[in-house]
């Protein structure tokens, strides 16, 4: 499964709104203090909203895989802070897509455990996964609970019937809620063309038949894994559009080493909540592989 780990494009280049914090991301001790004093402790997610990439600390996903009708899984993971390597703004963007380049890391002295040299040239704290994550999935009066056993978060197969659920995320004394939301259907007649090939991509074009129950078509294209960087392109368009075009300048920087690693698309419904510790994004989604004929 493509790990639901992706970040977001700017608010002005996608259909969903972006929820942002009023202040810069705080450190672990500040975050702990906020958790102790902030009111309320329960935060309702806003349907259709997303987290800004440099502010997201958590991700909840209820998802299906193309070709596996009726089978659903769910996952939830939360960190204490957002990743400080993520750029706050896209380097390139258009109406559908954004290309985000990892912030340059400045040299610094030896860093203690849990820290690394950051863009400021000083040792910077890196995200630490919460181990007390609990995800409640509700359907009518039935509830399924997934609990984290380690830093990987909470995950498992959804055993409740249906494809529409309410969810509740709990960690660090906080709760994020989202009302009944349906996993959107697989997109029919999904095809793709990659111009220029995987080594020198010049354009990517996707087409599909718009569904009656249309949400958002989303794709996260990371830089080749050999680069080991938080650099990526993300695109999101209404699934009712039936087409997506990605320009070459947003693809070519990702195709280093062994080439472009396009990982498919997602038909997704987004929601997000800005908590006292940071932004949490929720996705109800169907993953689909696309064979790129070029």
Residue ranges and their predicted role:
Residues 1-45:
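Ser/Thr-rich, Pro/Gly/Ala-heavy low-complexity intrinsically disordered linkers and tails
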Residues 38-198, 213-294:
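Ser/Thr/Pro- and often Gln-rich low-complexity regulatory segments
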Residues 209-211:
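Acidic, Ser/Thr
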